[in-house]
Amino acid sequence: LGQTDPDRRSNWAHTRDILLTADRLGYHNILLPTSFVVGQEPIAFASAIAPMTKNINLLVALRTGEYHPPMLARALSTLDHLLEGRLTVNIINSELPGYKESPELRYQRCGETIDFLKLAWSQPDRIEFEGEHYGRISLPADPAKPYQQNGGPLLYFGGISPDSKEVCAKYCDVFLMWPEPEESLYATMQDVSTRALKYGRTLDFGLRIHVVVRETAEEARAWARRMMSRFDADKGAALKNRTQDAQSLGVKRQDEFRESANDEGYLEEILWTDIGRARSGCGAALVGSPEQVLRQLRRYMDMGIRAFVLSGYPLKEECEHFARLVLPHLPNVRLSDVQGRRPAVPPVTPLTT
C-alpha cells in the first residue's frame, strides 16, 4: 500500500476486467465510485460496460449537484434500461470538485435531488416539483420512467453526521456504513431506524468493508503485513489526501478508530485498521480464514446488515479469493429483487417502445 503500480491503474481495461471478473464469479452488485482525481467517471463507465455484463447490478455513485435533476433522472433511467433493471445508485453529498460549499447548501441540494428522482420515478403523468434550491420544475414524467418499478432503482446513502442520517431516513433505501466496532455500528443502525420511523419508513443497512481472506488465519495476516511492508507514510498521506472526502467527518472517524487499535492495527479480533493509512474512505478490513470471515459476516447479518460492499488489494485477485473461499457459503441475492423493484417482464416505457 502507498505505492503506485502502472499495471493496476484505474484505466478502462483494468477496471473493466475487475467488473467482468466479479460478474463471472457470481457477485450480485458492484460499486462504481466517483472521483475527479482517479478512476472512471461512473455513469459513463456504467453505460459503456452495461452491454458486456450478464447478471451483476451496478451500484453507480453520483455526487448531487453535478447534474440538473431532470437530466439526472433521465440519464439514470436510460442506464436502468440498458441494464434491464440492474441499476442501483449510491448518493454522495460531498462538495463539488474545486468548490468549498456550506453543509446547508449541500444538504438542501442533496435532499431536493433525491426528492426529484423519487418523484420522477413514481408519477404516472407529470412531475410537479417545488424546491428552495432548484425552484419550480414542471415536466412530463414519461421520459424519465425507469425500467425498475415500485420506486425505481434503490438509493444507497452514507454519512455519520445527523444531517446525513436524516436525509437517508427521509428519502433513501439503504444506509451504507463504514467499518466500526460492532457496538458503534449497532448504535448507528438504531439511530437511523428511529429517524426513519418518523417518516413512516424502514431502511435496509449495508456495510462497506475490505477483506483479506486466505486458507488460514496465518496466511491472511501474513498478506496484511506484506501489504504494509513497503508503506511510506508521506506517500500514503499524499494518496489519501488527494481524494474529495479526505477531510470528511467519516474519514476522520475512521482515523480515530485506528488510533484505538492494537500494535498490529487490529481493533477487533479480525478487524484490521492499518489499511486506512494509505487510503481515504473505508478504513478497515476483515483479515482471517474463511471460517473467521464468514463468522464475522454472519454476526453483521444478525445485527440486521443485508448488503455488503467488499473490496481488497489487489481488487481482481481478492475478488477471486473471496468468491472461492466465502461467497458460496453466504446468502447471495439482489436486494432490488428482494424489495420487488425488478419487474418479471419488461415494462412499457418510452425507453422500451
What do the predicted segments below correspond to?
Residues L1-A13, A61-P70, Q149-I160, V211-R214, ...:
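Active-site mouth loops of central-metabolism enzymes
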Residues L1-T53, N57, Q148-P153:
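N-terminal beta1-alpha1-beta2 module of alpha/beta enzyme domains
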Residues R8-T21, A75, G158-V167, S289-Y300:
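Short, acidic/polar
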Residues A22, G26, I49, L79, ...:
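Conserved, mostly hydrophobic/aromatic
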Residues N29-I49, P179-E183, S311-A323:
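Glycine-rich, proline-tolerant flexible connector loops at the mouths of alpha/beta enzymes
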Residues I30-L32, N57-L62, L87-I91, L155-G158, ...:
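Hydrophobic faces of well-ordered beta-strands that scaffold small-molecule active sites
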Residues Q40-V60, A120, Y199, F322-V338:
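Alpha-helix-loop-beta-strand connector modules within alpha/beta enzyme cores
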Residues P103-G151, E180-M301, P331-T353:
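An alpha-helical appendage that flanks or caps ligand/catalytic pockets
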